[in-house]
């Protein structure tokens, strides 16, 4: 009997392969980074072939660097950066353009036109989304309208669209399987989340031929098997590909948030707060998003979601652009050296603001800066006085991450009618104790960090394992979850409320900054 499940975790900056055992423990992992492409201001692209090859390299490395053998693998599960859009020629297998990444803002003007056409309510009702350049639909239209030959290929039924998991599955199966799962389809702005089908009106409105769209399947089932003849992956031939899910719902599943009202927050490049709402779709009145979290068998479960575009990326900005820190640990050390941010508020709206604001034209700003900073290379500095040092700025960055999540949590509580009693966390930045303590203080509830923080990959592994009987059911999976540390509120509520009020004022300063 196979011993393990292999998860492919294809992210924004790297591709990873992680092997899990029956207890959800990591047996082996490998990672391969790839290049980010910035053709113009606000544009972000990836090379689809580099995505593919980096993922294949991670897979070969996970076997070569460990004692795990391909015959030990029961199934493969895939999780991916959502919304990122790839289109390719079904005959040659070659992409017609670079992947347009979820962060890319090139379709902001098109989104304004869609709003002007009065489509907001229809899109919100049918797809559970707001109109934003974030989602795949406008990216597809951009490629069809701007890449020479793309629309002609579509009209000849020779063009295929997919988010990243679709691209990987198509290639792993030798071009035999063109599918997506409910969670990824829910992020295209083209999918009817109630009737679980592509929405004809949206496709017609955006002039997107439905023939290019993948078939939508549950998140846990055998889609196909790894084909023979894939260079470097020859020994994986015949292994079932049995799970596919977007990165954030994957983390929700990996955190064993199986009951309505259970929630997780992932601190990665951005921050993503999701709450399981069960088989009931919650329609948000606070600009949060509704989508299918996962489908298993003939049932789907929904999630309500809020996202902040910049979180861990801000710490990287401090390191790479301002040269204030050498690594993320140094940011924590600086932040811990001061009791507060000394009145500083940093709004990390580098690519606009996500929920609940959805302001494509917001830009990053720092307000309340005082004299004394040695690295004052900021886009917007307001209120210079004396007394601030870089420790205050480092702390303001961590506080900004926590403030953004507080915005989302309060909106989510209002929409769902549920008061949070616990927040489960994961992602790279969740290793920061000071960040999680600030978070607990701001949301006034328990924050718990599991022993396994690779919950995105774990969720994909669980779904694949369920499909092939490696795990019996969700009860068995839930027993695997172990808590590493719990954070409880330490700050007086009155002080917390005062700080949060200042954050709201700072956000208003950043809004509409890039609008003509």
Feature locations, PLM:
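Auxiliary, metal-adjacent structural segments of Zn-dependent hydrolase domains
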Residues: 210-211, 334
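Carbohydrate-associated surface elements
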Residues: 104
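N-terminal glycine/serine-rich phosphate-binding loop of ATP-dependent small-molecule kinases
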Residues: 1-97, 125, 232-240, 443-447, ...
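Short beta-strand-loop/turn "lid" adjacent to the catalytic site in phosphate-handling enzymes
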Residues: 64-101, 130-136, 169-192, 217-218, ...
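Active-site core segments that coordinate phosphate-bearing ligands/cofactors
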Residues: 6-8, 22, 108, 114-130, ...
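Structured loop/turn residues at beta-strand edges in well-structured enzyme cores
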Residues: 68-71, 211, 418
């Amino acid at each position: 009997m196979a011993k393990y499940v292999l998860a492919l975790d294809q992210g924004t900056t790297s591709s990873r392969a992680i092997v899990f055992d029956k207890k959800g423990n990591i047996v082996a992992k490998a990672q391969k980074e790839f290049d980010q492409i910035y053709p113009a201001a606000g544009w972000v692209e990836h090379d689809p072939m580099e995505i593919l090859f980096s993922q294949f390299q991670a897979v070969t490395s996970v076997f070569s660097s460990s004692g795990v053998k391909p015959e030990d693998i029961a199934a493969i599960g895939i999780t991916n950066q959502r919304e990122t859009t790839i289109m390719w020629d079904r005959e040659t297998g070659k992409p017609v353009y670079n992947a347009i990444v979820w962060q890319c803002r090139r379709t902001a003007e098109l989104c304004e036109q869609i709003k002007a056409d009065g489509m907001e309510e229809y899109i919100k009702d049918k797809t559970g989304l707001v109109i934003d350049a974030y989602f795949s639909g406008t990216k597809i239209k951009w490629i069809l309208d701007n890449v020479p030959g793309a629309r002609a290929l579509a009209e000849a039924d020779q063009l295929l669209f997919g988010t990243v998991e679709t691209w990987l599955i198509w290639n792993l199966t030798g071009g035999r399987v063109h599918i997506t799962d409910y969670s990824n389809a829910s992020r295209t702005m083209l999918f009817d989340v109630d009737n679980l089908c592509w929405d004809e009106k949206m496709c017609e409105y955006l002039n997107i031929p439905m023939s290019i769209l993948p078939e939508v399947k549950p998140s846990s089932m055998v889609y196909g098997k790894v084909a023979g003849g894939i260079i470097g992956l020859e020994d994986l031939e015949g292994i079932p590909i049995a799970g596919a899910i977007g990165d954030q719902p994957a983390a929700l599943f990996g955190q064993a948030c199986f009951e309505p009202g259970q929630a997780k927050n992932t601190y990665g490049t951005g921050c993503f707060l999701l709450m399981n709402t069960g088989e009931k779709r919650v329609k948000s009145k606070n600009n949060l998003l509704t989508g299918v979290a996962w489908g298993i068998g003939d049932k789907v479960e929904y999630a309500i979601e809020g996202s902040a575009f910049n979180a861990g990326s801000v710490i990287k900005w401090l390191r790479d652009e301002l040269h204030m820190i050498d690594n993320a640990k140094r940011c924590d050390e600086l932040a811990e050296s001061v009791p507060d941010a000394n009145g500083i508020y940093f709004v990390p709206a580098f690519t606009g603001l996500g929920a609940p604001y959805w302001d494509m034209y917001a830009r990053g700003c720092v307000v309340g800066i005082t004299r004394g900073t040695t690295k004052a290379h900021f886009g917007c500095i307001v209120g210079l006085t004396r007394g601030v040092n870089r420790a205050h700025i480092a702390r303001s960055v961590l506080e900004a991450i926590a403030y953004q999540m507080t915005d989302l949590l309060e909106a989510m509580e209002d929409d769902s009618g549920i008061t949070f009693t616990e927040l489960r966390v994961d992602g790279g930045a969740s290793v920061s104790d000071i960040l999680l303590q600030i978070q607990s203080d701001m949301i006034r509830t328990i924050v718990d960090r599991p022993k396994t923080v690779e919950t995105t990959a774990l969720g994909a592994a669980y779904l694949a394992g369920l499909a092939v009987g490696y795990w019996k059911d969700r009860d068995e999976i839930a027993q695997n979850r172990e808590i590493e540390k719990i954070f409880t509120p330490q700050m007086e509520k009155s002080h917390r409320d005062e700080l949060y009020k200042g954050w709201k004022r700072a956000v208003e300063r950043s809004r509409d900054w890039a609008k003509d």
